[in-house]
């Protein structure tokens, strides 16, 4: 009889725990997020990078003017022309822009260039386009002999 009373008491305790009587225990919400679908066409259409020649042959440029922008070496820096970090060419002095095709002699430390030159047939030479700035002659900047 004592065992039956104990089982009834424990069964009543279990049902009291499992059946919610308080209103707060009726609805419990947790933070959740739906799984995201996969998307393929990321990025969309982007504008061009505007690479190319900025100053043509015969144009007058000042020091610091950008002569051309490029991703790979299409034009090489010549006389009075500097090379930027992103391979852009800029004028080091003011003058007139000239483009020439010259024989390209690669740096012997550059293994890719050496491999390219050695793979060419005997007697073949590489021609590359070089950009030069011909400095403008200074006019009226003479010093008098008495001032020296």
Curated annotation (Swiss-Prot):
Transit peptide: 1-30
Species whose genome carries this gene: Mus musculus
UniProt entry keywords in alphabetical sequence: Mitochondrion, Ribonucleoprotein, Ribosomal protein, Transit peptide
Chief place where the protein resides: mitochondrion
Domain of life: Eukaryota
GO biological process: mitochondrial translation; translation
Renumbered residue ranges of the record's region Disordered: 28-48
Name under which the protein is recorded: Large ribosomal subunit protein bL27m
């Amino acid at each position: 009889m004592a065992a039956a009373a104990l089982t009834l008491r424990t069964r009543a305790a279990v049902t009291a725990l499992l059946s919610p009587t308080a209103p707060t225990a009726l609805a419990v919400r947790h933070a959740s997020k739906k799984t995201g679908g996969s998307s393929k066409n990321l990025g969309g259409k982007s504008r061009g990078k505007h690479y190319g020649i900025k100053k043509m042959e015969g144009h007058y440029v000042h020091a610091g003017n950008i002569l051309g922008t490029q991703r790979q070496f299409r034009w090489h820096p010549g006389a009075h022309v500097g090379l930027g970090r992103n391979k852009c060419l800029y004028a080091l002095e003011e003058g007139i822009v000239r483009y020439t095709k010259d024989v390209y002699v690669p740096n012997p430390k550059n293994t890719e260039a050496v491999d390219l030159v050695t793979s060419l047939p005997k007697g073949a030479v590489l021609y590359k386009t070089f950009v030069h700035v011909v400095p403008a002659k200074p006019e009226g900047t003479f010093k008098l002999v008495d001032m020296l």
